[in-house]
């Protein structure tokens, strides 16, 4: 989720930890990528980030690829469908790098999906709480 990418980047920046993390987001499907060009952040998601003074300008969708598995220590999907897609694209998870974001809050539930609810603030709150717990687990 680009929302998670930029919320987490904002958190680490505020703690002066930007140099300690590489944070990016990738799609698990091609729905937001046309002719090899990714769409920008969905306008309502961009709007909710802007309301929280978080800038996501310039971000475009890219799809996760198998080579990403070796590049990152953790891969953090937003929901169970993302977990399945990531496992398929990455050909499994032998090093146990895939963890749903909400698992860091002690919950097994998915991040509220604004595609179905239209509630981008609830989605933001889920992601914020998940990112906060994730960061606390790492520092």
Segments from the language model and where they lie:
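A structural signal for well-ordered alpha-helical scaffolds and beta->alpha junctions
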Residues: 38-42, 79, 131
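Conserved active-site segments centered on acidic
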Residues: 1-71, 136-139
